[in-house]
């Protein structure tokens, strides 16, 4: 009789936050146990699991998973990993945590506590991360922080794609840059170009002034921005308002198009 092993209840709560994709469901392949110092069975503890201890290593396709101890549910192609958990995909993606439940059939990894995803110069920190190997997206839902070479971005909900290098932030978004702080409701961010796309009510605060906007983009490298939908730029006693504002924070110069007003 087949035994069905589902993710622990604490992991199911995030299912509704999963980002919908148009990708074909992943082809089912086997998870293999590569190494363990000891292997045992205990029907009183986990009747359907191989109990593994010491230098445990699994392989699933091109991904490797390491931990100190694990339960391996071979019948359902899944595993639970404990302590010093590490996932490696190629030589560019590394994910660490204290706990992992991995479903080899769906290729979804549920990592909990002290989770860190490293992808080149981008590092994601959270305590709850669900990582879908197909289509290669990690998402968090209890607060997270993404750090690159220039900015620190945090939010309550978020996701990051190691393939596209794009990050999405929702709810209590904050961007910390050496020259400014951005507060927003919804923000997309390209970790390569360092351009933030603003998609909700936002405030950008710097020594040179304050910007209020709900739509546009901000180039955090060149400190230039395009602000739409009657955005407002405040600098000293001056307030600039317009349908479209191209603003250079370094020079303090702004070009306004449509329904412009300047309060001095």
Model regions and ranges:
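N-terminal amphipathic/hydrophobic interface segments
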Residues: 1-264
């Amino acid at each position: 009789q087949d035994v069905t092993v589902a993710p622990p209840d604490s992991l199911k709560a995030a299912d509704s936050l999963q980002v919908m994709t148009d990708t074909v469901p992943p082809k089912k392949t086997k998870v293999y146990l590569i190494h363990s110092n000891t292997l045992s069975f205990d029907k009183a503890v986990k009747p359907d699991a191989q109990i593994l201890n010491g230098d445990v290593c699994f392989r699933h396709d091109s991904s490797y998973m390491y931990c100190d101890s694990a339960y391996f549910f071979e019948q359902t192609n899944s595993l639970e990993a404990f302590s010093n958990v590490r996932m490696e995909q190629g030589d560019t993606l590394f994910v660490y945590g204290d706990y992992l439940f991995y479903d080899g059939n769906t290729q979804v990894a549920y990592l909990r506590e002290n989770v860190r995803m490293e992808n080149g110069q981008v590092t994601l920190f959270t305590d709850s991360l669900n990582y879908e190997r197909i289509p290669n997206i990690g998402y968090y839902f209890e607060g997270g922080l993404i750090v690159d070479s220039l900015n620190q971005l945090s939010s309550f909900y978020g996701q990051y794609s190691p393939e596209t290098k794009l990050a999405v932030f929702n709810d209590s978004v904050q961007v910390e840059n050496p020259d400014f702080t951005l507060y927003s409701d919804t923000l997309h961010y390209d970790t390569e170009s360092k351009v933030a796309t603003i998609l909700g009510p936002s405030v950008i605060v710097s020594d040179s002034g304050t910007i209020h906007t709900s739509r546009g983009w901000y180039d955090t490298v060149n400190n230039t921005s395009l602000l739409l939908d009657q955005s407002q730029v405040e600098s000293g006693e001056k307030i600039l308002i317009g349908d479209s504002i191209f603003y250079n924070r370094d020079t303090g110069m702004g070009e306004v198009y449509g329904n412009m007003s300047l309060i001095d």
